């Protein structure tokens, strides 16, 4: 039997695996870089850019939970919590949390054990979840001087690491798993995660971390740089939902990892959104083929992938296109396509930074403005999404159904809602009309949640038809009149 025809092994991800998937499908996640989200003293004029620690803390997050909850997000993903290397490197300080030195201690820049415990407790009191970012692939060393292994905990010997050799071929899986990331400025020392001693530590460590702080989920950094077999017992020990950063645009590549990790960041979707909207370089037809159909042709369950259009590793949308219509279309797609939507801090405030560190500017300079038009736009979409999650059977588990697609318009349906998006842009004079059929035979009234416009379906022999044109190529989010009124009554 050839390797590609073998039946995959079904791994045990813990006794609550199915329950955890169902819980996280229902969420809208807000991603936070702790150092860049909120200060203890509520200051909004402190320094906000660069590669140094700027002062954001866990207590600062606690003080701004009303802001996140007002937006509508139901879960918070916080950056790594462990002690990092200190001092200024050629790439600045370890404010982001991904340069670990001691896995047994918290990062003192972010606060105390009491602060972190209170943050999770306060989220739970609001019926919100907390996801923690973790790194199991590497520790960090600054400069090209000899490494003092004794300062690292618990991996304090050269025998805990693969031999020093920097990664050059990111498409070679074996090389990705044993070579070091980084360079001589900051080298990321690749941990021998295949060793049983390392396995044992990490399984005990993550079990203790979850039991101590009651985190609800894990985001695993640099997931493709660790042997896949490491993950199932590790995730079973955590017994919470986990998704990995598998930085690759091919859904077939991602699918291989989903035999070992419950979920992954949906980079294939991100790259297709980028090509279709940032600004448009391909048609909506091609988007549908590559982003939707090619993903479904794999073994992936796309309903549990983590979807995003911005994060701490890629330039902001508005850095590449200032078209407001395109921005709104990408956010509509993000909230309603199959999967779990993730909003990166600052996205709701129309931040426009480019590559690291410009895409990581502190949020306090926005003054946490809840009247920002994109904050209000997202709030409306998230409110509808959560209503559908809570009240419409199958919304989180049934795959979307394409109703219409052409060069500039894509229409799809999920239980309770019809989504119409376009990549034509606000200044385009191309045709953005759409006519599509739905299975209901009778005439139905739909309301666009974004504009308040009303649309009626016209009965045909075995279905009914809806016709519309997108003004300024702005998206439409259609719900049945009865559902619309029910949502407003519950507000």
UniProtKB/Swiss-Prot annotation:
Q: Where in the cell is it found?
A: Cytoplasm; Nucleus
Which SUPFAM superfamilies does the record associate with it?
(Trans)glycosidases, Glycosyl hydrolase domain
Question: Which cofactor names does the annotation list?
Answer: Ca(2+)
Recorded GO cellular component terms are:
cell surface; cytosol; nucleus
Residue sites binding Ca(2+) 1 per the record = 137, 177, 190, 225
Q: Which InterPro entries match?
A: A-amylase-like, Glyco_hydro_13_cat_dom, Glyco_hydro_b, Glycoside_hydrolase_SF
Chief location of this protein within or outside the cell: cytoplasm
The positions flagged as active site in the entry are 221 (nucleophile), 245 (proton donor)
Task: Tell me a Gene Ontology molecular-function term this record carries.
Answer: alpha-amylase activity
Q: Where is this site: Transition state stabilizer?
A: 313
Known EC number: 3.2.1.-
Record-annotated residues binding substrate? Answer: 99, 138, 219, 224-225, 249, 312, 360
Which positions does UniProt annotate for Ca(2+) 2 binding?
A: 221, 245
Q: What class of enzyme is it?
A: hydrolase
The source's superkingdom equals Eukaryota
Which free-text remark accompanies the cofactor? Binds 2 calcium ions per subunit.
Identify the PANTHER family for this entry.
ALPHA-AMYLASE, ALPHA-AMYLASE FAMILY MEMBER
Q: Family, per the entry?
A: Belongs to the glycosyl hydrolase 13 family.
| Protein known as | Uncharacterized glycosyl hydrolase C27E2.01
């Amino acid at each position: 039997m050839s390797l590609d025809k073998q039946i995959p092994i079904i791994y045990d991800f813990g006794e609550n695996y199915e329950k955890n998937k169902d819980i996280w499908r229902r969420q809208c996640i807000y991603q936070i870089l702790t150092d860049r989200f909120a200060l203890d003293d509520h200051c909004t004029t402190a320094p906000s850019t660069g590669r140094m620690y700027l002062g954001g803390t866990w207590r600062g997050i606690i003080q701004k939970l009303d802001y996140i909850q007002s937006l509508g997000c139901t879960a918070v993903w916080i950056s790594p919590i462990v002690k990092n290397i200190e001092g200024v490197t050629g790439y600045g300080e370890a404010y982001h949390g991904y340069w670990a030195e001691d896995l047994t201690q918290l990062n003192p820049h972010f606060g105390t054990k009491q602060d972190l415990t209170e943050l999770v407790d306060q989220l739970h009191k609001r019926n919100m979840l907390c996801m923690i970012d973790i790194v199991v692939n590497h520790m960090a060393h600054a400069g090209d001087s000899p490494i003092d292994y004794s300062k690292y905990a618990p991996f304090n010997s050269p025998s805990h690491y693969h031999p020093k050799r920097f990664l050059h071929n990111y498409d070679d899986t074996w090389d990705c798993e044993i070579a070091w990331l980084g360079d001589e400025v900051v080298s990321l020392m690749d941990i021998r995660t295949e060793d049983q001693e390392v396995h044992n530590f990490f399984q005990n460590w993550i079990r203790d971390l979850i039991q101590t702080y009651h985190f609800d989920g894990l985001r695993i950094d640099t997931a493709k740089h660790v042997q896949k077999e490491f993950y199932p017992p590790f995730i079973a020990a955590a017994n919470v939902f986990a998704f990995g950063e598998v930085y690759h645009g091919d859904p077939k590549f991602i699918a291989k990892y989903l035999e070992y990790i419950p979920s992954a960041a949906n980079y294939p979707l991100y790259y297709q959104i980028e090509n279709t909207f940032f600004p448009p370089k391909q048609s909506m037809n091609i988007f549908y083929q590559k982003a939707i159909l090619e993903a479904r042709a794999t073994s992936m369950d796309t309903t549990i992938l983590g979807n995003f259009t911005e994060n701490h590793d890629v330039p902001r949308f508005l850095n590449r296109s200032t078209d407001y219509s395109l921005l709104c279309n990408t956010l509509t797609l993000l909230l309603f396509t199959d999967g779990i939507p993730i909003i990166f801090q600052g996205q709701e405030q129309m931040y426009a930074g480019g590559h690291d560190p410009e895409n990581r500017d502190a949020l306090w300079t926005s003054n946490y403005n809840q009247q920002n038009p994109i904050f209000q736009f997202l709030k409306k979409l998230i409110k509808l999404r959560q209503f559908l999650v809570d009240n419409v059977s199958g919304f989180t588990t049934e795959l979307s159904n394409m109703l219409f697609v052409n060069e500039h318009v894509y229409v799809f349906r999920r239980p309770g809602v019809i989504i119409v998006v376009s990549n034509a842009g606000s200044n385009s004079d191309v045709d953005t009309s759409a006519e599509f059929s739905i299975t209901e035979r009778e005439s139905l009234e739909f309301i666009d949640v974004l504009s308040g416009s009303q649309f009626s379906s016209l009965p045909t022999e075995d279905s009914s038809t809806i016709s519309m044109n997108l003004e300024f190529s702005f998206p439409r989010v259609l719900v049945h009149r009865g559902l619309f009124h029910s949502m407003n009554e519950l507000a």
